[in-house]
Curated annotation (Swiss-Prot):
Listed EC numbers: 2.5.1.145
Gene name of the record: lgt
Segments of skewed composition (Low complexity): 309-323, 361-387, 394-406, 415-438, 463-481
Binding site for a 1,2-diacyl-sn-glycero-3-phospho-(1'-sn-glycerol): R146
Family: Belongs to the Lgt family.
Protein name per the record: Phosphatidylglycerol--prolipoprotein diacylglyceryl transferase
Length: 491
């Protein structure tokens, strides 16, 4: 190995990438990843609320997306550099050592997107709109994460003599053995290389600025801003990969990440061109008005799924309760109450019908008929033409009973007047002759008795007739009301 200490480099590498606090190691790579995640959630939350979303949504989705993204990134790295772990001299267990570096961005975006999709399904929010809100924050998090590559002295490019070249130092452990990840540099420069981590970091920042400005000017939505993020990052990554010379899987002599970048770039451009233009309305970003549970509260998540259309209206419950036949018809509560009151009044009128009070019965029957007519008007064609005929017959019978009562009253009044005239005529005759008076009294008594019997008989007959008419009227009214009640339940 040839050490080069005479080359002036403007960018030195950190002497180490891990520090120990007692037995606990603090790795710069992990700290950069965590810092990037925190910044992405914080900024993404602000952007989501500015677009009309509810506070806390980005953190909720991140509880799914971040673990999925870390697993996907590591899986992509292991799959594309499998010889490092499963080849000759490799240790398969080290494939799980995520803290030692090695995250493939394409695997992180793909599997992290699946986690975000699951969360958006649970919380009932549109995934494309969510992607647009977090696209610039994600890319900024990637830029921060690239600093971890600097601390680990990894993902650098070919050797160069440019003044911004990066110094690479060999690192050794306490025993003096080479340890690039956990060791400490002795200050001797091994080589000067292209700082590809810095190239990608600066490119990411430029794309972030471009995305923010484009979003402000054109109000991009429906996932098209996220597509621009993917396309912009892929374009820059393609050229950065051309400058790297570290170990990687090759396809036809070309690094596999170059193929991936090209394919993803084309797919992102196609989505941007054919996706819906404009931006979603702010109300579409609302999850439905229920308290968001934490992801590990599975029972609460199931309960939250019921609230997609909001809580049930109180009126709907009341209308279902008023349905007496159990078929849960959507009868409005106010109409059901009015119909119930009318039916009760009609039945009360039938129960209180009395032949001795024909006038009140007739009036009550008219009221019941009017109520039945009003009920039919409220519910439309529920009674039918036969009900109209019954109500007309009831009204006619009530009118006949009233006429009969009036005729009976007139006859009784006439009989009373005749009796008064006869008594007035008999008084002078009594003054002239006692015998004549006695005879006249007997005659008047018989005549009065006859008239009394006749009047009583007339009143009995008329009362009987009126009672019969009232009963018929009440029955007709009851039938009409029963049909109205039946129509109410069928409405």
């Amino acid at each position: 190995m040839t050490l080069r200490s005479d080359v002036l480099a403007y960018i030195p590498s950190p002497p180490q990438g891990v520090w120990h606090i007692g037995p606990i190691p603090l790795r710069a790579y992990a700290l950069c990843i965590i810092l990037g995640i925190v910044v992405a959630i914080w900024w993404g939350e602000r952007r989501w609320q500015q677009r009309g979303g509810r506070e806390g949504t980005v953190l909720d989705v991140a509880m799914f997306a971040v673990p999925f993204g870390l697993i996907g990134g590591r899986a992509y790295h292991v799959a594309t550099d499998w010889r490092k772990y499963f080849g000759e001299g490799g240790n398969p267990v080290e494939a799980l050592y995520i803290w030692q570096g090695g995250l493939g961005i394409w695997g992180a975006v793909f599997l992290g997107g699946i986690g975000a999709w699951i969360a958006c399904r649970i919380y009932r929010i549109p995934l494309p709109a969510f992607g647009d809100a977090i696209a610039p924050p994600i890319l900024l998090a990637q830029a921060i994460g690239r600093l971890g590559n600097w601390f680990n002295q990894e993902l650098y490019g070919r050797e160069t003599t440019l003044p911004w070249g990066l110094e690479i130092y060999p690192r050794f452990d306490a025993a003096g053995d080479p340890d690039p990840m956990n060791g400490i540099s002795n200050g001797v420069v091994e080589k000067i290389v292209h700082p590809t981590f810095l190239y990608e970091l600066l490119w990411n920042v430029l794309v972030v600025i471009a995305l923010v400005q484009l979003d402000k000017r054109f109000r991009i939505g429906h996932g098209r801003l996220f597509a621009l993020y993917v396309a912009g990052y892929s374009f820059g990554r393609f050229f950065v990969e051309l400058m790297r010379d570290d170990e990687a899987t090759l396809v036809a002599g070309i690094r596999i990440n170059n193929f991936t970048s090209a394919l993803v770039f084309l797919a992102a451009i196609a989505y941007f061109v054919f996706a819906t233009k404009g931006r979603e309305a702010p109300e579409r970003l609302q999850p439905g008005g229920t308290t968001r549970p934490w992801p590990w509260q599975l029972a609460a998540l199931r309960a939250a799924g019921v609230a997609a259309n909001g809580p049930a209206e109180p009126g709907a419950t009341a209308s279902t309760a008023t349905d007496t036949d159990g078929d849960a018809k959507d009868t409005p509560p106010s109409d059901a109450a009015a119909t119930g009151g009318q039916g009760t009044a009609a039945k009360g009128d039938r129960g209180t019908a009395d032949a001795a009070d024909t006038a009140k019965d007739a009036s009550a029957t008219d009221s019941a008929s009017n109520s039945a007519s009003a009920t039919d008007s409220d519910f439309g064609e529920t009674a039918g033409s036969s009900d109209d005929a019954d109500r007309a017959a009831a009204v006619k019978a009530a009118s006949g009973a009233t006429a009969a009562e009036k005729s009976a009253a007139d006859k009784e009044s006439a009989a009373g007047e005749a009796a008064a005239d006869t008594s007035a005529a008999d008084q002078p005759a009594a003054d002239k002759s006692g015998s004549a008076k006695s005879a006249a009294d007997k005659s008047a008594g018989k005549s009065g008795a006859g008239r009394g019997n006749e009047s009583e008989s007339t009143r009995d007959n008329e009362s009987t007739s009126a009672g019969t008419a009232a009963s018929a009227t009440g029955s007709a009214g009851a039938g009409a009301t029963d049909r109205v009640d039946s129509g109410e339940n069928d409405a």
